[in-house]
Amino acid sequence: MDDRRPDLAKRFALAAHSNAVLPILLVLEILETTIVPFPYEAIFVALCLAAPQRTWLFVAVTVAGSAIAGSILYSLGAGFAEPLADYLNVQEAVEAYKSTFSERGGALIFLGGLTPVPSYFVNLVAGATGYPFATFLALFSSSRFIRFALLGLLIHLFGEAILAQWSRLPIVVQRTILILFLAAVTWWSIAKL
């Protein structure tokens, strides 16, 4: 067996420093924001811990992915809401909801991007109700920027201390924590489907 082969943590750190990780991160954020609910933040945090000097680049790529995904969902809502409402014969309910969304939509869009709950419903409804696209995109992108910039800032401030504590743990404890974390991520992903 070759002892010179880097362990998983070192390989992940090498990947975090590679430019090849950026398009992968972009695609993962697009998928997470549109159709595949999974805890994207875990990947984001791990990358930021592995390559702290690239945190703001990871924030920028994440916000770009969110903007692309939000735009896709907005377009789907705008394109398919009316035919679907006609098919289901719920035009009056849709019109009533449009007026409510026009009054409170900005807050809903902003909170949808800021919180860790899946935001696809808000993005679809924004398109379905005809909420102004530029305003939608500005609100959603700025809320995602705030969310991931704060997370990046916390990692920047406390990441080294967390890694130092982690490295002091016995390997069996580290592996147990990782297994529990993966089990929790798997349960969370399945529960969101």
Give, region by region, the residue ranges found by the protein language model.
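Hydrophobic alpha-helical membrane segments of integral membrane proteins
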Residues: 11-62, 100-161, 190
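Alpha-helical transmembrane segments of multipass membrane proteins
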Residues: 32, 69-73, 147, 151, ...
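Hydrophobic membrane-targeting alpha-helices
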Residues: 75, 79, 157-161, 185-192
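Membrane helix-loop-helix hairpins that form the core translocation module of multi-pass transporters
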Residues: 56-94, 103, 154
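Short, Lys/Arg-rich, polar N-terminal cytosolic tail immediately upstream
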Residues: 1-15
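Selective transmembrane alpha-helices of multi-pass membrane proteins
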Residues: 85-109, 167-193
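Membrane-helix boundary connector in multi-pass membrane proteins
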Residues: 161-167
